[in-house]
Amino acid sequence: MNAVTTEKIIIPRSALFLGYSGLVPFVVLSLLLWWSPPHYAEQIQHALWLYAAIILSFMGAVHWGVAMAKPYDSGTGEPDKRMLLLSVIPALVAWFASFVSGLAQWSILYIAFTGLCVLDTESTKRGDLPAWYPMLRVPLTIIVVLSLINAQLAIAIA
């Protein structure tokens, strides 16, 4: 009789707590945009956009850490250049989006969060990130993207 075993993947509690706690500003600020007077809405928009840009940069930095922690490339004595490059792109995208006016800057952010999530999932498949990472990252990204779309709609309708 062949036994099939599957390893149960468990997300570390600290990562779970911090990850979901990090959603609070996204959700709260995006909802506040629907009910805020115009003079407060601009400050809320700025706070949400800035928080999203910072978190996007932070998420990209995961790959910098991976590049530093894993063995250096085949004898070159240098970290994985692909991982280093991937780590700085989200910060550059967020910075670029700060120069874009109107609703497009929100689209840039939620597209970047989505793209980075896909890349993170691929990095997990390659063994660069822990198996639990996408199980945390995908639901968080969905909530972030929905919050940013919600904010974009609230701004467009206001």
What are these regions (language model features)?
Residues 20-27, 48-71, 78-96:
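Core segments of alpha-helical transmembrane spans in multipass integral membrane proteins
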Residues 98-115:
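Transmembrane helix-loop-helix
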Residues 12-34, 141-148:
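The first (N-terminal) embedded transmembrane alpha-helix
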Residues 111-129:
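Transmembrane alpha-helical segments of integral membrane proteins
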Residues 1-11:
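Short, Lys/Arg-rich, polar N-terminal cytosolic tail immediately upstream
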Residues 150-158:
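Juxtamembrane boundary at the C-terminal end of a transmembrane helix
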Residues 123-145:
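Interfacial loop-to-transmembrane junctions
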Residues 34-45, 157-158:
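Membrane-interface helix termini and inter-helical loops of multi-pass transporters
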